[in-house]
Amino acid sequence: MAKKVAVLAVNPVNGCGLFQYLEAFFENGISYKVFAVSDTKEIKTNSGMVLIVDDVIANLKGHEDEFDALVFSCGDAVPVFQQYANQPYNVDLMEVIKTFGEKGKMMIGHCAGAMMFDFTGITKGKKVAVHPLAKPAIQNGIATDEKSEIDGNFFTAQDENTIWTMLPKVIEALK
């Protein structure tokens, strides 16, 4: 039986990255639910398209056991994350990431996804692919220059243009 995936979409989210995951999951019969890293289900893509997703991240807290994997879908919200780190939805984001990681669930992400995983301490000793500008921020994991890395339960890609290099392995692991 296919696994169930919690997809985190920051606001704004990179639509190119988000929809690669969603379309691949849909086409392969993998169940997913999209959670806005926001206080509302209405978010935007980097290009301004309005999306209404399934739920908000606050409602994922405490329900981590209902999912087998977590996707962090990056976007323009990440470069300004530090300015908004104390917002309840970003506090929830970090708690949810840490909980999924500590439970050994599949951790999937691109661009700054590995950096967000690393901030929680769950990447210790794991090879991760991350956006080149975020590479110096990796303190626990091992940042590489590869387009994507798969190390244990971590599936990471440098950016939305390299998700395709890991997506077949992500789908295989989720089926």
From Swiss-Prot:
Binding residues annotated for Zn(2+), in chain numbering: C74, C111
Effect of C111A: Loss of Zn(2+) binding. Decreases thermal stability. No effect on the binding of flavin derivatives
Name of one Pfam family that matches: DJ-1_PfpI
Keywords: Flavoprotein, FMN, Metal-binding, Nucleotide-binding, Zinc
Annotated effect of mutating W164F: No effect on the binding of flavin derivatives; however, riboflavin dissociation rate is increased. No effect on homodimerization. No effect on thermal stability
GO molecular function, one term: nucleotide binding
InterPro entries registered for this protein in UniProt: Class_I_gatase-like (IPR029062), DJ-1/PfpI (IPR002818), Prot/Nucl_acid_deglycase (IPR050325)
Keyword field contains Flavoprotein: yes
Assembly and interaction partners: Homodimer.
Annotated protein name in UniProt: Protein ppBat
Organism per entry: Bacteroides thetaiotaomicron (strain ATCC 29148 / DSM 2079 / JCM 5827 / CCUG 10774 / NCTC 10582 / VPI-5482 / E50)
